UniProtKB/Swiss-Prot annotation:
This is Large ribosomal subunit protein uL14. Binds to 23S rRNA. Forms part of two intersubunit bridges in the 70S ribosome. Belongs to the universal ribosomal protein uL14 family. Part of the 50S ribosomal subunit. Forms a cluster with proteins L3 and L19. In the 70S ribosome, L14 and L19 interact and together make contacts with the 16S rRNA in bridges B5 and B8. PANTHER family: 50S/60S RIBOSOMAL PROTEIN L14/L23, LARGE RIBOSOMAL SUBUNIT PROTEIN UL14M. It comes from Dehalococcoides mccartyi (strain ATCC BAA-2100 / JCM 16839 / KCTC 5957 / BAV1).
Length: 122
C-alpha cells in the first residue's frame, strides 16, 4: 500500500527516477493507494534533462506495489517494488515508454494507454 511519504520508483521515460507521495486522490479521507489509484507526488530525484524536474509536483498512477493483494478470482499478486507512472493533465501517461510489468487492474480504472505501452501485463 502507498500512503503519504512513501517513495516510489518511476516506471516511465519522463526522466524522473524517484517520487514521494504527497496525497492519495479519490475521497476525503482516503489514506492508502492500491494499484490503479491516482496520487499527487513530488519528484525527488531526476536526470538532468528530465521532463519532470526535481521538486515539481505531479500526478501519478500506481502500477506496482510490494504488498500482496487479492484479485476477485482468489489469487494473490505482489511486485518487487513500488512504482508509478507520471500523468499529464488529461490523465494520460506523460512518457512514451513504460518499464517493467504492470498490473491488470489498470484496465478496470481506464488506463488502457499504459497497458498498451507496457512490455508485460500481469
Amino acid at each position: 500500500m502507498v500512503q503519504q511519504y512513501t517513495r516510489l520508483n518511476v516506471a516511465d521515460n519522463t526522466g524522473a527516477k524517484k517520487i514521494m507521495c504527497i496525497n492519495v486522490l479519490g475521497g476525503s479521507h482516503k489514506i492508502q493507494a492500491k494499484v490503479g489509484d491516482v496520487i499527487v507526488a513530488a519528484v525527488k530525484k531526476s536526470s538532468p534533462d528530465a521532463q519532470a524536474k526535481s521538486g515539481t509536483v505531479v500526478k501519478a498512477v500506481v502500477v506496482r506495489i510490494t504488498k500482496p493483494y487479492a484479485r476477485p478470482d482468489g489469487s494473490y499478486i505482489k511486485f518487487d517494488d513500488n512504482a508509478a507512472v507520471i500523468l499529464n493533465d488529461k490523465m494520460e501517461p506523460k512518457g512514451t515508454r513504460i518499464f517493467g510489468p504492470v498490473a491488470r487492474e489498470l484496465r478496470d480504472k481506464k488506463f488502457t494507454k499504459i497497458l498498451s505501452l507496457a512490455p508485460e501485463v500481469l
